[in-house]
Amino acid sequence: MNSPQYTDSNYSEDEGLEDYKIDGYHPVHVGEILLDRYVIMQKLGYGHFSTAWLALDNNNGNYVAIKVQKSDERYIQGAYDEIEILQALAKKNFDKEWINSLREYYKDDKEKLNELETVEHTQVVQLLNCFIHNGQNGKHFCMVFEVMGVTLLEIIKRYNYKGIPLPLVRIITKQILIGLDFLHRICHIIHTDLKP
């Protein structure tokens, strides 16, 4: 299996070193193995609460994205809340009402229609695993996700902030609206943090 290609241009800033301390970020490095299973391949990005890494799952040969939370206790509760929501979403992937909605959404796309019974088409990221990693800066909650594509912000940057071609806007908008429909109508969850 080929590794997904993510270049250093996928993120132009770094999180700085000041938060690599007790209760802060874990200093993940390429080649590090987490949970005796996930081999870190490269950095995907970071946020205020965590860093994100591309990893190879040695159990099945698949690539995954791992979010490594800061170790401060305040962030642990947020991680538990996120996991609770993601697990609730996973239970609804094959909801009969949702599958019928997808048939309607993709009625003109025979390839998608054939996949509906076997593949999750929620347009919402899927949690694959979670664990605690004991690192030099504390205990870090880690969440393992399926690997997704680039962010909307990266697409905007690729077009030099001059607008995205309309056909691509249509595809992205449809995916976002399908994901929001799944969250709102099927899962009764309101997403309050949409951003590129």
PLM regions: where:
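Juxta-kinase regulatory segment immediately upstream of eukaryotic protein kinase catalytic domains
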Residues: 1-33
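Glycine-rich ATP phosphate-binding loop
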Residues: 30, 51-70
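Protein kinase glycine-rich loop
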Residues: 40-48, 52
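Residues forming the ATP-binding cleft of Hanks-type serine/threonine protein kinase domains
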Residues: 44, 69, 125-134, 148
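Conserved protein-kinase N-lobe ATP-binding Lys motif
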Residues: 67-75, 90
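AlphaC helix of the eukaryotic protein kinase fold
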Residues: 80-87
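Short beta-strand micro-motifs within the conserved protein kinase catalytic domain, predominantly
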Residues: 99-141
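Conserved alphaE helix
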Residues: 139-142, 147-196
